[in-house]
């Protein structure tokens, strides 16, 4: 329901991706359908009593700047500031600030680079959702069989939101792309 509601908003507000010479698509497509990932995570946090507050705050920060970027382009430095800040909040949640400062700097750069590299997959029907499902399935396996690092319900809730997204994206003519809000 949330995704269908978003489609109406995106259509009214003209949140679209127009094809250009680098595009793999040829028709105008709604952008920002990946907002469903945030809503899935938010649903988990609401049900769990905000178990991971710094993670939620970081996710909200990245969702905000990425959605703004989907609506109107924001500067690279602004986005990077938000991304580094969000990663620092996640590191705090995970207790990583006990590491040497240079490990933290390297980890911030690598993790921020990875989330931005993930963004390049968006726009090819099914690849963002498919890759996300593979990663989430691997994380669910590791979480269950190797080491528990998060409540399993969190991973399963996000998997459900990715499946909803795939329903609209993994087809010959995608109804939507994840946009920065879903791929970052």
Regions found by a protein language model. Name each.
Residues 1-184:
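"…together with the soluble PPM/PP2C metallo-phosphatase catalytic core" -> "…together
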């Amino acid at each position: 329901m949330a995704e269908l509601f978003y489609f109406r908003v995106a259509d009214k507000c003209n949140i679209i991706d127009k094809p250009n010479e680098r595009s793999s698509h040829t028709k105008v497509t709604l952008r920002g359908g990946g907002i469903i990932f945030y809503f899935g995570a938010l649903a988990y946090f609401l049900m769990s009593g905000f178990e991971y507050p710094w993670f939620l705050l970081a996710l909200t920060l990245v969702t905000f700047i990425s959605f703004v970027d989907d609506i109107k382009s924001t500067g690279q430095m602004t986005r990077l500031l938000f991304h580094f800040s969000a990663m620092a909040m996640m590191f705090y949640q995970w207790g990583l600030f006990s590491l040497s400062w240079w490990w933290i700097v390297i980890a911030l750069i690598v993790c921020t680079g990875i989330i931005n590299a993930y963004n390049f997959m968006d726009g090819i029907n099914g690849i963002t959702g498919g890759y996300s499902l593979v990663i989430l399935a691997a994380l669910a396996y590791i979480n269950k069989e190797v080491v528990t690092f998060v409540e399993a319900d969190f991973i399963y809730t996000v998997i459900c939101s990715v499946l909803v997204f795939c329903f609209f994206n993994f087809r010959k003519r995608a109804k939507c792309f994840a946009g920065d809000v879903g791929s970052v």
